[in-house]
């Protein structure tokens, strides 16, 4: 499982280290490959990063749906066609393709955030703004918090 948030730096070749706890989770999943794709929450762009096994489960779910559904087609055009498979190198880094890095507006400093079965890569400034906005929305919504049943 992927949880927590970590600040990392993208090097001049576009590589970024996968946080050590996330590398440990990948070892536990016996996954050596990752799939990166575009994502957006509200107006904040980032990259979703899936272990290959989780990505394959997502593709299986998508394949079981009506492939002619216009909404599903739009989603697949955005989410699946933009996906890029990569390996974690011997130093625990992944190469972020320039097209994906440009989409997410990634600067030199990024935040890598866990989201249970996958993780996200954000530009640090974008993540700080998004986190602050989400904190206000979540903590201010007592009805939602009360209904979580956790």
Region roles according to the model:
Residues 1-7, 12-13, 22-86, 90-91, ...:
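Flexible "stalk/tail and boundary" regions
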